[in-house]
């Protein structure tokens, strides 16, 4: 009975999550952690005080706010870190979180260079922690069906990707800032390269 009781208590213990980033995806993930049972947000991290305050207010205003990731990581000691900040911060934050003993969810792209991505993978293996990347299309019903259908059509000989995202107003400011940290093919194109790999069974 003792072991079963311990397992039950462990299952009821919420996963303590530090949420990094308060943009579109950061907000989406924070809302999910806020609403889902089994998770407890221990802090909201973003460089913009206005963005932090706005997100915190949307979540009820009860969460600690931090402008510095490393200070937040040290202060909150989370079980997991959810990284939805600009791509050029992903490797630094992910490696630091893993080194602190945390599991990591990181929005795509994992990193802006192959070397940085390999550094994250190596650290995760070293400390035996999980890293999950936000490849949402892998789990989207329409895309999973599309992949299955394509695989019945025979061997693909040519694959072409055309990604056209309209941007204006405040969205353009965000997208322009993103393009200063990495190219669109790395930022968004990774979704479709990943799908191509799944279609062909190469990954």
Where are these regions (language model features)?
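Short, Asp-centered acidic motifs that coordinate Mg2+ and/or phosphate
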Residues: 43, 80, 158
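Beta-loop-alpha module in the N-terminal Rossmann-like domain of NAD(P)-dependent dehydrogenases
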Residues: 29, 61-123
């Amino acid at each position: 009975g003792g072991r079963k009781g311990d397992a039950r208590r462990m299952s009821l213990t919420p996963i303590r999550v530090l949420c990094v980033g308060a943009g579109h995806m950061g907000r989406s993930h924070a809302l999910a952690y806020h609403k889902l049972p089994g998770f407890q947000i221990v802090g909201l991290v973003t460089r913009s005080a206005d963005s932090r305050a706005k997100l915190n207010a949307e979540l009820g205003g009860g969460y600690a706010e931090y402008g510095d990731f490393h200070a937040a990581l040290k202060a909150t000691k989370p079980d997991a870190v959810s990284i939805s900040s600009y791509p050029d911060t992903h490797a630094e934050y992910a490696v630091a979180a893993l080194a602190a003993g945390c599991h990591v969810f990181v929005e795509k792209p994992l990193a802006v260079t192959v070397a940085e991505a390999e550094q994250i993978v190596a650290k995760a293996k070293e400390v035996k922690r999980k890293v999950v990347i936000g490849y949402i299309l892998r789990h989207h019903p329409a895309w999973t069906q599309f992949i299955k259908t394509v695989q019945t059509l025979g061997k693909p000989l040519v694959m072409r990707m055309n990604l056209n995202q309209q941007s204006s107003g405040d969205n353009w400011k965000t997208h322009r800032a993103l393009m200063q940290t990495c190219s669109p093919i790395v930022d968004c194109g990774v979704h479709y390269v990943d799908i191509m790999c799944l279609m062909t069974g190469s990954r």
